[in-house]
Amino acid sequence: MLDIASTMRRSALILLVLARTASAQGTVSGQVSLLERPGEQSEDLTDVIVWLEPAAGARVRTSPTTTTIQLQGRQFSPRVRVVSQRSRVEFPNADSFSHNVFSKAPDGAFDTGVYPRGRTKDQTFKEPGVFPIYCNIHPRMTGYVVVLATPYYAQAGEDGRFAVAGVPAGNYVLHLWHDRVAEGATKTLAVSATGATLGTIPLDARGYRFVQHKNKFGQEYTSASGDRY
């Protein structure tokens, strides 16, 4: 009887330790720097997206949300929005003229059609990936919706600092993305119950070259489109 009781106590203790370890959540923090050509240094790094995926490839639960990218001043605001997959993004038109939001991304092409001031169109992003978005009327309008299959992500501050909160202890692959860095960057790391503090992580944008996108028909924008500025 004593052996059975002792074994049960040890089993209960092990289960308690495992439960506490599994529920332990920390914050992964660090800072991103952007390497650019002379004269092109960015002062705002809020377009940098950081996320963590379990190193073993385990699937994690995400919660879809509804968020907004406003069309104002012939710009997408914010220019970059990060969401969990299956989230809905609304595109309210706050300008005094019409817009036509579209994307040609293979896993999520869409076209809102032309709509006037005060109207809102929306799109649900079902698959993870980076979705460039444009306006078919205004050629300089470019934005991005970054859709992730993980709840562990953050958008950097102006100075490049980031903090991904609520990360369970374990091994992860850290991903960093910026639209001017073709390959992005990845880093494997172990997250303890208290999280992980990283140093400065450089992203190399020196190879970036601007290329004007085509309209939704795959054609060059007309001069009349440019005159709308």
What are these regions (language model features)?
Residues 2-12:
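Bacterial N-terminal signal peptides that target proteins for export
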Residues 19-21:
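N-terminal signal peptide c-region/cleavage motif recognized by signal peptidases
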